[in-house]
């Protein structure tokens, strides 16, 4: 299996409460963070989609909207909505605010898709990264079951589903732009 046979979905539906503004629209290199991620991953994957609660991008991207079945704002709902759009395949899911993840990290995770796992995510010494990994579309119903019990954390899947945590030493590769200062620092290094 090759990366260019797979689909990628960039999650853009977070509340961005710590950032104080919508992270998906932060500007990097004369484009918003969403466009930055879509451009990068379009060179790697078969298709790149954007996941959000509504179309805040004026039809600029292939959009997967959150299901209206549940009136919550959560990563589990986004994952359920994403996986419901695919049949019998792995999908790479990444948060829009992780701009340093790239092909090297993906290639290290890729071989585990051929093994008996349904979830393959990145893990660094300090964190598991549930919004940086491959999820099999067959998990949509499991996500729905959690939502019906009002369970919103993606990490709950790991105890029920065969999951591979792919070890990475470099925390920096999985930088999340949660605060404006982190964004400013990252932006200044791009110049």
UniProtKB/Swiss-Prot annotation:
What the record says about family reads: Belongs to the MobA family.
Keyword Transferase on entry: yes
Q: Which ranges form a coiled coil?
A: none
Where in or outside the cell it occurs: the entry states: Cytoplasm
MF-aspect GO terms: GTP binding; metal ion binding; molybdenum cofactor guanylyltransferase activity
Name the source organism.
Campylobacter jejuni subsp. jejuni serotype O:2 (strain ATCC 700819 / NCTC 11168)
Complex and partners: Monomer.
EC numbers listed for it are 2.7.7.77
Q: What is the name of this protein?
A: Molybdenum cofactor guanylyltransferase
Q: Which residues bind GTP?
A: 11-13, 23, 66, 97
Gene name of the record:
mobA
| Binding residues for Mg(2+) | 97
Q: What is known of its domains?
A: The N-terminal domain determines nucleotide recognition and specific binding, while the C-terminal domain determines the specific binding to the target protein.
